[in-house]
Swiss-Prot record:
Membrane topology note: Single-pass type I membrane protein
Keyword Disulfide bond among UniProt keywords: yes
Protein name: Protein jagged-1
GN (gene name): Jag1
Keywords (A to Z) from UniProt: Calcium, Cell membrane, Developmental protein, Disulfide bond, EGF-like domain, Glycoprotein, Membrane, Notch signaling pathway, Repeat, Signal, Transmembrane, Transmembrane helix
Classification lineage: Eukaryota, Metazoa, Chordata, Craniata, Vertebrata
Annotated Polar residues bias: 1188-1199
Domain comment quoted from the record: The DSL domain is indispensable and sufficient for binding to NOTCH2.
Tissue: Widely expressed in many tissues, with highest expression in brain, heart, muscle and thymus.
InterPro entries hit by this protein: DSL, EGF-like_Ca-bd_dom, EGF-like_CS, EGF-like_dom, EGF-type_Asp/Asn_hydroxyl_site, EGF_Ca-bd_CS, Growth_fac_rcpt_cys_sf, JAG1_1/2_dom
Disulfide bonds, paired cysteine numbers: C187-C196, C200-C212, C220-C229, C234-C245, C238-C251, C253-C262, C265-C276, C271-C282, C284-C293, C300-C312, C306-C322, C324-C333, C340-C351, C345-C360, C362-C371, C378-C389, C383-C398, C400-C409, C416-C427, C421-C436, C438-C447, C454-C464, C458-C473, C475-C484, C491-C502, C496-C511, C513-C522, C529-C540, C534-C549, C551-C560, C578-C605, C599-C615, C617-C626, C633-C644, C638-C653, C655-C664, C671-C682, C676-C691, C693-C702, C709-C720, C714-C729, C731-C740, C748-C759, C753-C768, C770-C779, C786-C797, C791-C806, C808-C817, C824-C835, C829-C844, C846-C855
Location of this chain's protein in the cell: Membrane; Cell membrane
Amino acid sequence: MRSPRTRGRPGRPLSLLLALLCALRAKVCGASGQFELEILSMQNVNGELQNGNCCGGVRNPGDRKCTRDECDTYFKVCLKEYQSRVTAGGPCSFGSGSTPVIGGNTFNLKASRGNDRNRIVLPFSFAWPRSYTLLVEAWDSSNDTIQPDSIIEKASHSGMINPSRQWQTLKQNTGIAHFEYQIRVTCDDHYYGFGCNKFCRPRDDFFGHYACDQNGNKTCMEGWMGPDCNKAICRQGCSPKHGSCKLPGDCRCQYGWQGLYCDKCIPHPGCVHGTCNEPWQCLCETNWGGQLCDKDLNYCGTHQPCLNRGTCSNTGPDKYQCSCPEGYSGPNCEIAEHACLSDPCHNRGSCKETSSGFECECSPGWTGPTCSTNIDDCSPNNCSHGGTCQDLVNGFKCVCPPQWTGKTCQLDANECEAKPCVNARSCKNLIASYYCDCLPGWMGQNCDININDCLGQCQNDASCRDLVNGYRCICPPGYAGDHCERDIDECASNPCLNGGHCQNEINRFQCLCPTGFSGNLCQLDIDYCEPNPCQNGAQCYNRASDYFCKCPEDYEGKNCSHLKDHCRTTTCEVIDSCTVAMASNDTPEGVRYISSNVCGPHGKCKSQSGGKFTCDCNKGFTGTYCHENINDCESNPCKNGGTCIDGVNSYKCICSDGWEGAHCENNINDCSQNPCHYGGTCRDLVNDFYCDCKNGWKGKTCHSRDSQCDEATCNNGGTCYDEVDTFKCMCPGGWEGTTCNIARNSSCLPNPCHNGGTCVVNGDSFTCVCKEGWEGPICTQNTNDCSPHPCYNSGTCVDGDNWYRCECAPGFAGPDCRININECQSSPCAFGATCVDEINGYQCICPPGHSGAKCHEVSGRSCITMGRVILDGAKWDDDCNTCQCLNGRVACSKVWCGPRPCRLHKSHNECPSGQSCIPVLDDQCFVRPCTGVGECRSSSLQPVKTKCTSDSYYQDNCANITFTFNKEMMSPGLTTEHICSELRNLNILKNVSAEYSIYIACEPSLSANNEIHVAISAEDIRDDGNPVKEITDKIIDLVSKRDGNSSLIAAVAEVRVQRRPLKNRTDFLVPLLSSVLTVAWVCCLVTAFYWCVRKRRKPSSHTHSAPEDNTTNNVREQLNQIKNPIEKHGANTVPIKDYENKNSKMSKIRTHNSEVEEDDMDKHQQKVRFAKQPVYTLVDREEKAPSGTPTKHPNWTNKQDNRDLESAQSLNRMEYIV
C-alpha cells in the first residue's frame, strides 16, 4: 500500500477548537450548524476503478484479477440543494470536503467511530432546508503530481434530515465497490429548530431577561415579556395609555397623571373639592363652586357648624347662620353659660369660662383640651448611648445597651468580666467596647476566627486551598503561575488564516478576519446574503462577518420573521378587537391604526358587532385564527412510494431510492455509468441494474472468470448462489430485490410521526416533517404559542395547536385582555353619587347625607365634642363611660366614675382642675403599704353616697355585694377606691343603657381585712328595666368564669350577694293584745281576761314557726337563674319549684349591725364556692329548731360541698357565695 499523502482536512483537535470558537462567536461567524459524514466501511474486492482498470494498473493474465497493489482510498463529498433528478455537475452549494487516505481495497472502521480521519464536517451559515442531495465519491490516490487521481465509485442520495445528535446510516450497494457511511446534522450552540436558524442565548441584562427551552424558545423570566423579554410587565391594572414601567410590577405615570395605576388625572393646582377627567381640570363636586371648587354652597350640610342643637341656614357660598336654642349663643352656638360647672378639666386642671365655652389650664405634667394626656417624660430622650427610655409616672427609666450602665446609661460597663475573648492573651476594657489581644493565627473581636491564608492570594478567579500557614492556587484553564497570574498565549501557533489577526483571550483565541473572509479561522469566503436569509420582503446587506436585514415596518427580528407588536413599545389605544391606535409622526392626525395581530401572521382581522371578530386567511391557511396550513398533500400526488412534504399552498415529493422527478414518476437509469465490463449489456432495474455478460465473463459487473458471486454481489447480508449463467441472492428478513437492496418493511411503518407529521425514510432511519405548531424528533412537542406573554393585564394564555387564547383576569376583556371593563357603565351609584371605575370594581363617592358601598344608606348628622368631629354611629370611651354619636346627639352611659387615684409628692398635679391629691385614710388602704398613694378630692364637691341601706334590695334599685380577695395575688399599695374604680371600668357597665345613672360605692369590711362591701344603685329607672339586677348577675358570671384580663377579677376568692333579713310576722300581736287587755279591764272580767290571754298566746307560738318555712321558700325565687350542677333528687326529695313564693322579698346585704345579728336565726343561706372549677351550691342550714334538734332541708344540702361550709356564724346568714 502506498504511503498516504499529506493532504486532507485539519485534525480533530483543531476542528473541536473551530466548533468552540464558532459557538462563542455565533453572531460573528454566522455559522448555525454543520453537516457531518463519517465513512464506516469499504468493499472493493478486486481493487478496481470505476472504469474497470486496476488501481495499480496491472491485471493477472490468467484470471484477470488485479495483483500488484491495493487502492489508496479516500472520499470526496458534495452537498447541494435537493434535486429530484440528480446531476453530477453544478456547484456544491451547501459545501464540500474530503478525507485523507483512510484505507485500501476493503476496510471496516465501525469499531473506531469518532476517528477524525474518516469524518467530514461541512459547516453552514444558512437556514438548514432539511431536504438535500448528497454526492459521495470514493477515489484512489496516485501519490504523485503527474498521474491524476482516479474514481473508484460514486453514490448519490436525496432525502430529508432534521438536526439531531443521532446518526443515519446509508449504503452504496451498486457498482464496482460497496461502501457504508452515516450522516447527521447538528446545530451549533444557542441555535435551535429544524433549520438551525432559531438563535437563543440565555441572558439577564438590559437587552433581555430570558432562558431557552429545548426547542430554542425564549422563556421570559418572571415579570418580563416581549419578543426579547426586555419589556417589563407593569403592575396589574396599570393604564397602558398613561403609565409605563421599566421594572416588573412598577407603574410610572406620565406627566399629569397619578394613582397606583396611573389612571387618575392630576387636577388643577389648588383645586379643593373638585375632580378631573383630563389633567389640570377642576370639575366641582356636589354643593361646591368657584374656580377652584373652594366655595361651599352647602356649608351647613358639609361642616354642621352649629353646636348644641343649633339650627343652621345657608346664606351664600361659604356663609351660614346659626339659630341657637335657649341658653346658648355665639356664631356657632358654642357659648354656654356656666360651662365650668361640670368640672370638665381633669388632673387638677383649672377651668376658665371663655366666650367659646371653657379653657383648661393644666397642672404640671398634664396637657390636652381637658388635661387628660400625661406628658411624656421621655421626650426628649434622657438616656445616653442608645439607651431606651421607658416613661413612668413623673419620671422615667433607662434600659441600657450591654456596654453601658447607670441611671441614664452614662457609665461604661466592663465587658471583660464576661470573658468574651476565646483565643487571646488578654482582654482590655475600652469605652463602650473591649479589645482582645489575639494569639497568632486568630482574629475577630473575640479571637474566635481562624485567619484564612488564602485571602487575596490567587488571581484570575483561581480557587485557593488553605494550608497550614500557607496556601495553594488551583488555576482555571488558560492561566498558570504560583498565583495564576500568567495568561497562556493561545495565539503562539498562529492559527488564523488568510491574513487574519489573532487576538489572545482567556483559554481561547479569536481571529479578526479581513474584509471578505469569515469563519473561526478566517477560512471561509462566503456571501452571507446568498441565499437570502431575510424574510417578508426584507432587503439583505452583506457585512464583513455578518448580514443585516432591513425589516418592513410591521416586522422585526434578526431575519424579519416576527410580527412587530407596536404596543409593547408604544402607547396604544384599543379601538376594537382588530384595531389599535398608536402615536405616529408619519400621519397628519398623529395616529396610525395597526392590527391587533389576533389573526396571527397568516390572516387579516375583520371587526364584527359586539366586540367580536373574524379572520380572513391568506392562501394556504384556514382555521379560526388562520393557524392551520391547508394540507396540499391530501390528494397523494407523489408516486412510486414517494413522500409528500406539505408547504404553504404547495408541496414537494421526496422520492424513494431509484425514482426521481417532480412526482417521482421517473425510474433512475442505473445503467447511465456503464457498470458492465467486457462488453456486457446493462439492463436498468429499480434502484439497481443487471449485466448480461458475454465471452465467459461472470459476476455482477462481468468482472470475473470464476464465479457469478463475490462479497459485494448481494447486499444487506444476502447470500449469493452461482447458477452458472447468472446469480441469485437469498435475502434476509426485511429485504428484497435482485441484490437485496429494497427494504421490505419501511422504517416509517407504522408511522412514528405524531400530530400529522410526515415520515421520510432515510436509509435505515427516518425523519419527521412536523406540521406548523409542532416540534421535536417525532412531532410530540407543541410549540409554545404563549411565549412570550401575548396577554396583557395578567391574562392567562391557553396554548393551542399553532394558536393561543387569552383568558382575561377579572375586570378586563378583549382578545389580548387590553380592554379595561368599565364597571361604572351600569350607573351603580345612587342619589347622584360619583362613580369611579377601578380594576374589576368601582367606588362610589357619596354626596353629604349618604353612605354605603352604593350610597344607598342615609346617614345621620355627625357630632362635635371636645373640638373633634365624630361620625354618626361612632363610639368612644370617656373615662369609665362609653359614648356614641346618634344623629348629631352625644349619648353616654351614666356611671359615676368616682375620685381618681393619684400619687403624692409629684412635681405636677395629676388631678383634674379644682381637685388636689389627698392622702388616703389608713382604713382605706386595702393592700399595705399605701405610702405615697392618694385620691383626687375637691373641697367644694361632696362625695357621692349611695342611697342603698342595709335593708335595700332589687325593688329598691339597690344591691349589696361583699368581695373576698386573695391578697397574695394583689400588688401592694391598692386602696379601696382603686378596687372600686376598676369595678366601674368593667366592660359590662359600658353597655348599660344611657337612660340610667349608675353609682358604685365601696367600703372596707370591719370584721375581715380581706373583704370589701360594694353598694350598687341606680336612678332614673323606668318600669320596664332593672339594671342593678342585670349588673349584679353579670359581675357574678364574670367572677365565676374568671372572664376578662383584670387582675382584680383573678384575685377574687368569693362573692356574696346578701338578702335583707325577713321581718317577724308576729309584730301585729302587740296592738292586738293591748286592745284585748283594754276590753278586759273595762269589763272587769279577770277570769275571762286570763283565759283570753292564754288563748291568744298559743296561736302566737304557731305563728312564730311559720316564717321559717316561708323564709325557706323565699330562697328559691332568688335562685331561679342559677342551676345547681351537683343537685340530685332522691326519692324523698320535694321538687324545688314547690318552694317558690312570689310574695317573698329579696335582700342582698351583708351587715354587722347588732340588731340584724340577733335576727340571723330566722335567715337561710345560699352559697356557691369555687373548687377546682366554679360551681354554684345552695346551702340551707339552721343552728337549732325550737325543738332543740338541728334541721337540714334535703333539697339544699349536698355532702360533697359540706366540707367547705363556713363557720356557724357565717352560716347563720343567707347569702350568695361565689
